[in-house]
Amino acid sequence: MEGVGAVRFWLVVCGCLAFPPRAESVCPERCDCQHPQHLLCTNRGLRAVPKTSSLPSPQDVLTYSLGGNFITNITAFDFHRLGQLRRLDLQYNQIRSLHPKTFEKLSRLEELYLGNNLLQALVPGTLAPLRKLRILYANGNEIGRLSRGSFEGLESLVKLRLDGNVLGALPDAVFAPLGNLLYLHLESNRIRFLGKNAFSQLGKLRFLNLSANELQPSLRHAATFVPLRSLSTLILSANSLQHLGPRVFQHLPRLGLLSLSGNQLTHLAPEAFWGLEALRELRLEGNRLNQLPLTLLEPLHSLEALDLSGNELSALHPATFGHQGRLRELSLRDNALSALSGDIFAASPALYRLDLDGNGWTCDCRLRGLKRWMGNWHSQGRLLTVFVQCRHPPALRGKYLDYLDDQLLQNGSCVDPSPSPTAGSRQWPLPTSSEEGMTPPAGLSQELPLQPQPQPQQRGRLLPGVAWGGAAKELVGNRSALRLSRRGPGPHQGPSAAAPGSAPQSLDLHEKPGRGRHTRANLSQTEPTPTSEPASGTPSARDSWQRAAKQRLASEQQESAVQSVSGVGLPPLVSDPCDFNKFILCNLTVEAVSANSASVRWAVREHRSPRPQGGARFRLLFDRFGQQPKFQRFVYLPERSDSATLHELRGDTPYLVCVEGVLGGRVCPVAPRDHCAGLVTLPEAGGRGGVDYQLLTLVLLAVNALLVLLALAAWGSRWLRRKLRARRKGGAPVHVRHMYSTRRPLRSMGTGVSADFSGFQSHRPRTTVCALSEADLIEFPCDRFMDSTGGGTSGSLRREDHLLQRFAD
């Protein structure tokens, strides 16, 4: 057996030698090495680069993070054992210098972050070993000068950040070694001068940011940007530019975004943007422009967004945006504009976002064309809400143009800046019946139409159930019909406000086709006969005819205003779903409820819908009350629906039902809280009834009360038991208290000792027989018994003295 045990022992020893314990990796002090390829030493309070000699395999480290420490110097041996390193982060330290051989062994490094340190220069040759470097961050340092050797060897560099330094100039060919550079950040420096060849060899550059520098007041030399054939984004904002020379960007055929905001530009050459056919976004906000040359935007055929806010523009030529057919967003807010032509945006059919707020608008006849264009575009759903708030005249201060009545725009002696219609489409008003002797000038009777034709975009669809008379059908094209807005209804002018002297200067009936109310009947009455002699040969006759026409038009406008105030006219034209929910949709009621279905009905006020959008549809939203998230179920209903029945509902369950309008496939982003109704389905017949929550609540309350009573009873019984036990201990019989009284002599008490301990067994241990305690008086006879049996007289006397001292009064 001993031989077998020895054999087993040696086998165990050999097994332990064959499989030695794996050596644990030793991580540098204050660092984290949980991932074998990532050495994390960020925000550890380090003042020097930790030694990596303790790492078992430093060649496996691919990422080394040292950001957020207090490192001031990088030596030549800090990274010499990390030959496979791909990413090195040294940001937010206090590095002042780099040893020329710091990166000598990091030939595979792809990302180097040196931002937010105290570097004052990039010594030529320091970065040369980094042949595979693709990203270099040197932002937030104190670099004041660059040389061509600073980036020698960085042929693979794609992104370079030098922003937040103190660079004062860019020498020629400073970025020449960076042939593959795509992104260059030079913002927030002190660059005053751009060399003629500063960006040479950067033919692949796509992004260049030169904002927040101190560039010279005039940017005139186009040769600076000649090498940047692939540039798509150029940011020159927040400089001190005051003037742009002609064709300064002509060598940037792929430029898509140009930002010149926050400068001091007061003048732009008419050919400043020549050659920018691909430009999609132009930002000129925050300058001092007071006018735009007519041909300034002509080359920008692809322009989609233009920001001219925060300038000093007081007027714009009607043809300023005549070549911007793709323009979608335009901001003219916070300028000094008082009027705009109605045709200034006619060449931009894609325009849907227009900001005109913050100008000093004068609401008179010069804004009639703009109001008409806004109404047409908004009715077709092609334009978001435009806020044009009147500042002048004082009577209209604070009012919004889009809901002002045309009668309120007759003030002042002004001429509509919108171009007059062509001769073929011009329509003249006719004199009254009392002035039959006056005839229009020769040739005008043949141009007079029989009936005013409404514009195609104004012909709306009428909902069923709305009665429309013949006169209303002829007035479908009324441009001045009420249009609802989120700001509520606009002011109306009484009939007394329309006077013959306030008639408009223009005689074009297309401006207010609904005011004249010309029908075939009254046109036939006022049309001059062919036998009438024309009186238009002399200027006096022509002037008298025009005065009569103005009086006739004023009277018709007065009559139309009276009718509009009295409620006679067309229903409102609604294209916004939020306005539809607020003003048109009403009275959602629950008609019938069963165990598994419910019927709801709603009402729709009279209105018109634009032709491109079609009639209003409805969306019904319903869900069990209190469920999160709300409205998991909704149903789209067809046009002309005013009721719906919900099926497959759960019996005896509360539901919340809401309805909202759908116009042109769009719904209001605001929840339809104003058109909701609650219902509770009936219990299912013959089925098991649902839970009675009231009864369940009462039962639970009763059970809780019973539990509280039981707890109180248990506590009371325990307290009562304690009281009784204490009373029993304190109320012993008189003869017992008299027996153990300390006032009696000890001799009289010794007579009962033999009787009390007559059953004493001498073979039991002494400690078992008498468990002594100094706090118990019953120990006394037991002590005397033990002393009397083996102690003698002297022991008894000593104990008596002790007890006398202890129990003396």
Swiss-Prot record:
Q: Give the protein name, as stated in the record.
A: TLR4 interactor with leucine rich repeats
Q: Which residues does the annotated region (Disordered) include?
A: 412-462, 483-563
Q: Which Pfam families match?
A: LRR_8
Protein role:
Component of the TLR4 signaling complex. Mediates the innate immune response to bacterial lipopolysaccharide (LPS) leading to cytokine secretion.
Q: Signal peptide location in the record?
A: 1-25
Native species? Mus musculus
* Extracellular side stretches: 26-694
Q: Which residues cross the membrane?
A: 695-715
A Gene Ontology molecular-function term? lipopolysaccharide binding
**Which top-rank group of organisms is this from?**
Eukaryota
